[in-house]
Amino acid sequence: LKFLGFEQTFKNALTTLPMGGAKGGSDFDPVGKSDAEIMRFCQAFMLELWRCIGPDQDIPAGDVGVGGREIGFLNGMYQKLAREYHTGVLTGKGMTWGGSILRPEATGFGALYFTQHLLHEAGKDIKGKTVAISGFGNVAWGAATKAIELGAKVVAISGPDGVVAIKNGITKEMIDYMLVMRASNRNKVQDMADKFPKDCVFTADKKAWSIPCDIALPCAFQNELSEEDAKELKKNGCWCCCEVSNMGCQPDAIHFFQNNGVLFAPGKAVNAGGVATSGLEMTQNAEHLSWKAEEVDARLHHIMESIHEQCVKFGRQVDGHIDYVKGANIAGFMKVAQAM
């Protein structure tokens, strides 16, 4: 948790927005819990937290296990305790309570914008490329949505129970069903294959990395991609991995990618679109305005382009190769150091 907070500080610095960075959480697992149980936990959590947060203090947002529902419960309890209404206390809120449009899918959208610029820098085009995605939550949903919008072909999504291979590429109808799967709390990706048996093939206890692809997008949780997975990806023809989940790749996997000609970009740069859009939500709250989807998307795209430019600036080696890990670390550190 401490290291995630450390990483968050540099990630927020990369966004160019005036935000610090921190991480927090609990060991409460919402899987299998009723709405009432989750609400009671969120209320109890906020009962201890509310004095430590505020629109000009610390501003929590969602992450693994915390989506719009949980943010809504937390926000409602805060307003009750504070006895005055503040829209900017949390981000990731519903639109009714001062949330920003596109916030749920922002991490995935931003990741694909970054990937698009990375490929362009390497002289490649994202159109027609095959993509494997781990997970089927908000991040994976956003990534899959933007991937097909940009012309890529998503050939695999995975969950705790296994992987679904989609030979002809994921469709809009399948992407919409990902939200139904997540809302069911079953946590089983096999439901996708059961819903679309003609297009999907489910394999139990396998990862998305077992499916041949051009681009791998870890979108689930930290340390999900091991060195063995990296080797399997390389063997199956993968030549690019963009880390969408926080610290999704184990250090040995990153070293393997870097030493074997696989383009790799770290999570602190790739997934910064989520926190960047939280920053945009804070701006809208401060202005008491709600922007249209086109404006939020355009600002997000601009931020991700800026992050990519910073990575290239600080990560370009003497031979012209770009070390995105080094570039992201130096760019983030430079801003934090200058602020201090």
Where are these regions (language model features)?
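General beta-strand structural signal in soluble alpha/beta enzymes
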Residues: 57-61, 85-90, 133, 156-159, ...
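Buried hydrophobic packing segments
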Residues: 1-4, 74, 111-119, 143, ...
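Flexible, glycine/charged-enriched surface loops at secondary-structure junctions
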Residues: 16, 53-62, 85-88, 122-130, ...
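Glycine-rich phosphate/diphosphate-binding loop of Rossmann-like nucleotide-binding domains
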Residues: 91-94, 99-212
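Rossmann-like adenosine-cofactor binding region
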Residues: 162-264, 269
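Adenosine-phosphate binding glycine-rich loop
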Residues: 118, 232-340
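N-terminal ligand-binding/catalytic initiation module
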Residues: 1-101, 335-340
